[in-house]
């Protein structure tokens, strides 16, 4: 109460921020007349003037009013669009490292040009992050005209680009790309063996478009680069035979009494977490079946250490058969299982689920099973985006997640007022008893809209639902277009024309996101088609464009008079934000519009979270079939259920981050070491430190610290030095001749002998020649052990929750054991590098070159690289990418063709590659 009174007196934090920003907007507006008088060249020259002022030490905040005014004037000339004052507010918010919530149709893409231009003046690069490649390419081309006019360069960062193309994209003043691609480039840059192979040039400033989708929806799944592991095809096929022989338990057992089970069975399903659990009976049934299949011994159990992998495969088969359904979670095309994005309904070709789930689905569908993957590098979006010096974002729906943005990323949300107040009528939900009644009511609403000419957008949560609506509309003979994964190449064009008279569009959730639905259709698209028509002369084009404008204006007014775009949704999503995004497609820029959700008690969200309460209301009211509940209490009940799901998903993301923070600290150390090694001119200090550490550990095994002579094993130390390290050191003789010798004296002699042996080796070939070999050995050892460490952390993470049963804190145990594992990693690198460099037999520079080339070949040989990344569903999905293999240096597999240093140069000069184009590297 007191808080509300204070807010009314002083205004909210958001109100105070906007008040401050409006003063800056007044200063920008005051410059408009002055800049209108400038010629194009004079306006463009302002960019270099600003760059010089920034280089001289002037703050960006001081330049902001002038820079924003320049962008507005440039946009008026090039884009024929003038930034509204509210877009200026959004731009200031983005420059200050905040999230700008701007409603659909308010021009977020144009708003971003303001802070992008300002921050690009530093010359350190600006990254604009979009949700998909289509939007990255579209926005880069669209806004690139403005940036180029103002004298800035623009690059597009897409998957499967060559190293040179990516370097050019990152070296531009402004780079457009997807969140996944930026993250993968960061990981790949920390896997290369040559400084010149890196593509990124530092993480200065990023603006994330659809920030809620990228930093919230996709943050439950890390980015993973992996390589193929051992083949388990037979195991997946065998486990697929086990699942049909198991039965589902009905009812939940009370953990205290064991009561509550109505029908015993082998497994239970938790739909909330999408997990399957074997019961005690299920374990016994599975063990019996596996014994009959010859996969385990008669007395063996699934908990035996030798059978841990069987458990992994069995649970993957259970999830594949019981939780993942064809045409809802995936489709089968050309003998392959292709994942469907549950949020957008798009097909995610080339991507794969991880943890053996994809292979289990392949076994279930009877298609060819492809191999599992081993993690080579990994990072979460939370930790990747926190690497940027400054981060900002924009979306139409951030306020519901404002707490999470602040808690996880330290990002404040600023709600920007709309340019025109929304006139959309968001009607109360209608809840029916059955799915059939729900669809009948929705179809009736669609028919009424069609008969009066009002355009309709029907939103569904899956391809399956969109196909049901499709079939029902076909039956009713209502013309319509379906926008789902099976034709996503045309989705932007379909969405653009969804606001025309009598048009019915079925869309799976947010398919076509980023494209405005304009009432009367998208005039710009029609004009573009005319301008691209080479068969028409200029006069004919102008006449046709004038005709199109007149027809569009007439249709635009007709649609407005009919009530604008009608949104009809057939299901509530888990997140209120996704529902708000669907509603936001209507009523843009002050246009009229309306929305209605048609629900049933059979919908997943209702069934799991809110069904009982609503069902009780229906029964009390004795609702007849076909009648719906339409009341505020029902809508509030559903939103309460959504809040529960959102809170659970937030906890999942926060827990993921807490565990990944441990790995992130270690990742920073490893990547910093790699970069130091690659950038260093000399590695003598690092190699000497590793060597001393290695021989200290070795010596202390035979001559413990602060020990007396009787505890020493000098003979054993001499033997190991000679046999394993080829160092002949007569310590026993010196011990007899010396009057007094301590354990420290012995250690010094061993280290000195090792240093001499190493110096002799280097002297034969020359330190300069040896440095590159040292660099390769160090990098390969770090990479190999880091990959093994990632696997170890993954296994540790999967089983750490069991420590809770021993009254231990799982997170603390994870931190402690991860720290111990990291110590083992550093010891392994130290010992391996020292061993290789001390024992390798090299007598000449030519032999050194051969050894280095062999190591490079081993490093760059790889059978497959796969990239696992999340989509808006938060599910892990993987794509195979052969085109970037040459940029990623990994061990094991089939060699990728490359030119050896001593091979003839491909240019045809007849010289060796190292003496010709190899010098360029």
Swiss-Prot record:
UniProt xrefs under CDD domains: DEXDc_SecA (cd17928), SF2_C_secA (cd18803)
Matching entries from InterPro entries are given as: Helicase_ATP-bd, Helicase_C-like, P-loop_NTPase, SEC_C_motif, SecA, SecA_CS, SecA_DEAD, SecA_motor_DEAD
Q: Which cofactor does it need?
A: Zn(2+)
- GO MF annotation: an example: ATP binding
Task: Give me the Gene Ontology terms describing cellular component.
Answer: cell envelope Sec protein transport complex; cytosol; plasma membrane
The answer to whether the entry has keyword Protein transport is: yes
Kindly list the positions annotated as binding Zn(2+): 905, 907, 916-917
One of the GO biological process terms: protein targeting
Q: Does the keyword Transmembrane helix apply?
A: no
Q: Which reaction does it catalyse?
A: ATP + H2O + cellular proteinSide 1 = ADP + phosphate + cellular proteinSide 2
Spell out the subcellular localization from the entry. Answer: Cell inner membrane; Cytoplasm
List the Pfam families hit by this protein, alphabetically.
P-loop_SecA, SEC-C, SecA_DEAD, SecA_PP_bind, SecA_SW
Function, please? Answer: Part of the Sec protein translocase complex. Interacts with the SecYEG preprotein conducting channel. Has a central role in coupling the hydrolysis of ATP to the transfer of proteins into and across the cell membrane, serving both as a receptor for the preprotein-SecB complex and as an ATP-driven molecular motor driving the stepwise translocation of polypeptide chains across the membrane.
Could you identify this protein by its name? Protein translocase subunit SecA
Q: Which gene encodes it?
A: secA
């Amino acid at each position: 109460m007191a808080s509300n009174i204070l807010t009314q007196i002083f205004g909210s934090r958001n109100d105070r921020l906007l008040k401050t920003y409006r003063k800056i907007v007044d200063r920008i507006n005051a410059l408009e007349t002055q800049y209108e008088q400038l010629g194009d060249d004079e306006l463009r020259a302002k960019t270099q003037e600003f760059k010089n002022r920034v280089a001289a030490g002037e703050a960006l905040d001081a330049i902001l009013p002038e820079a924003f005014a320049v962008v507005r004037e440039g946009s008026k000339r090039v884009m024929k669009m003038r930034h509204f004052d509210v877009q200026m507010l959004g731009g200031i918010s983005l420059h200050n490292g905040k999230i700008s919530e701007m409603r659909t149709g308010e021009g977020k893409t144009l708003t971003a040009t303001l802070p992008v231009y300002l921050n690009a003046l530093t010359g350190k690069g600006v990254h604009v992050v979009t949700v998909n490649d289509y939007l990255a390419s579209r926005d880069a081309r669209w806004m690139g005209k403005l940036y180029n006019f103002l004298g800035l360069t623009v690059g597009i960062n897409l998957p499967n680009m060559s190293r040179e193309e990516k370097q050019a994209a990152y070296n531009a003043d402004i780079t457009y790309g997807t969140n996944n691609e930026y993250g993968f480039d960061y990981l790949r840059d920390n896997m290369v063996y040559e400084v010149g192979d890196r593509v990124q040039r530092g993480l200065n400033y990023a603006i994330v478009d659809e920030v809620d989708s990228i930093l919230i929806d996709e943050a439950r799944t890390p980015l993973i680069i992996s390589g193929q592991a051992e083949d388990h095809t037979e195991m997946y096929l065998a486990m697929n035979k086990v699942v049909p022989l198991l039965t589902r338990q009905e009812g939940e057992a009370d953990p205290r009494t064991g009561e509550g089970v109505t029908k015993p069975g082998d497994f239970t399903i938790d739909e909330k977490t999408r997990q399957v659990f074997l019961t005690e009976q299920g374990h016994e049934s599975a063990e019996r079946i596996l014994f009959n299949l010859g996969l385990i011994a008669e007395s063996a159990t699934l908990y035996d250490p030798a059978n841990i992998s069987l458990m992994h495969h069995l649970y993957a088969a259970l999830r594949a058969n019981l939780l993942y359904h064809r045409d809802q979670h995936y489709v089968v095309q050309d003998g392959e299982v292709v994942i469907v994005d549950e949020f957008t309904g798009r097909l995610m070709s080339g991507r794969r689920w991880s943890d053996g789930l994809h292979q289990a689905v392949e076994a279930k569908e009877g298609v060819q099973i492809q191999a599992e993957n081993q993690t080579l590098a990994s990072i979460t979006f939370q930790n990747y985006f926190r690497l940027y010096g400054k981060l900002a974002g924009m979306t139409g729906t951030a306020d519901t997640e404002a707490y999470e943005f602040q808690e996880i990323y330290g990002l404040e949300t600023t709600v920007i007022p709309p340019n025109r107040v929304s006139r959309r009528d968001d009607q109360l939900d209608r809840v029916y008893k059955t799915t059939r009644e729900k669809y009948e009511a929705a179809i009736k609403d669609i028919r009424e809209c069609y008969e009066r000419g009002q355009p309709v957008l029907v939103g569904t949560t899956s391809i399956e639902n969109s196909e049901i609506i499709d079939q029902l509309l076909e039956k009713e003979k209502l013309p319509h277009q379906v926008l789902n994964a099976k034709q996503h190449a045309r989705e932007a064009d379909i969405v653009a024309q969804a606001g025309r008279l009598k048009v019915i569009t079925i869309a799976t959730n947010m398919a076509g996101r980023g494209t405005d639905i304009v009432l009367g259709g998208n005039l710009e698209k029609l004009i573009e088609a005319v301008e691209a028509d080479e068969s028409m002369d200029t006069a004919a084009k102008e006449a046709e464009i004038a005709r199109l404008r007149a027809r569009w204006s007439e249709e635009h007014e007709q649609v407005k008079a009919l009530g604008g775009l009608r949104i009809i949704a057939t299901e509530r999503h888990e997140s209120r934000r996704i529902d708000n995004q669907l509603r936001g497609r209507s009523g843009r820029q002050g246009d009229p519009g309306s929305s209605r959700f048609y629900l049933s008690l059979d919908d997943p969200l209702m069934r799991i979270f809110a069904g009982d309460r609503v069902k009780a209301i229906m029964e009390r009211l004795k609702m007849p079939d076909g009648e719906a509940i339409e009341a505020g209490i029902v809508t509030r009940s559903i939103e309460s259920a959504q809040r529960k799901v959102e809170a659970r998903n937030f906890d999942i993301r926060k827990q993921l981050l807490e565990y990944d923070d441990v790995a992130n600290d270690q990742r920073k150390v490893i990547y910093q070491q790699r970069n130091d090694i690659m950038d260093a001119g000399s590695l003598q200090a690092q190699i000497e430190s590793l060597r001393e550490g290695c021989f200290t550990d070795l010596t202390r095994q035979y001559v413990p610290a602060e020990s007396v002579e009787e505890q020493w094993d000098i003979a054993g130390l001499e033997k190991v030095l000679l046999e394993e390290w080829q160092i002949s050191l007569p310590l026993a003789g010196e011990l007899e001749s010396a009057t007094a010798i301590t354990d420290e004296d012995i250690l010094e002699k061993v280290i000195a002998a090792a240093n001499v042996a190493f110096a002799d080796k280097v002297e034969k070939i020359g330190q300069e020649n040896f440095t590159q070999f040292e660099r390769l050995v160090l990098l390969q050892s770090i990479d190999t052990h880091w990959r093994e460490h990632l696997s170890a952390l993954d296994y540790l993470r999967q089983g750490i929750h069991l420590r809770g049963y021993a009254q231990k804190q799982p997170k603390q145990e994870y931190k402690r054991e991860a720290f111990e594992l990291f110590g083992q990693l550093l010891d392994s690198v130290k010992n391996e590098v020292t061993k290789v460099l001390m024992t390798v037999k090299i007598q000449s520079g030519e032999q050194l070159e051969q050894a280095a080339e062999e190591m490079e070949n081993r490093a760059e040989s790889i059978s497959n690289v796969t990239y696992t990344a999340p989509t808006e569903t938060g599910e892990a999905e993987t794509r195979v990418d052969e085109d970037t293999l040459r940029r990623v240096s990994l061990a094991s597999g089939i060699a990728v063709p490359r030119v050896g240093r001593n091979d003839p140069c491909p240019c045809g000069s007849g010289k060796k590659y190292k003496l010709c184009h190899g010098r360029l590297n």
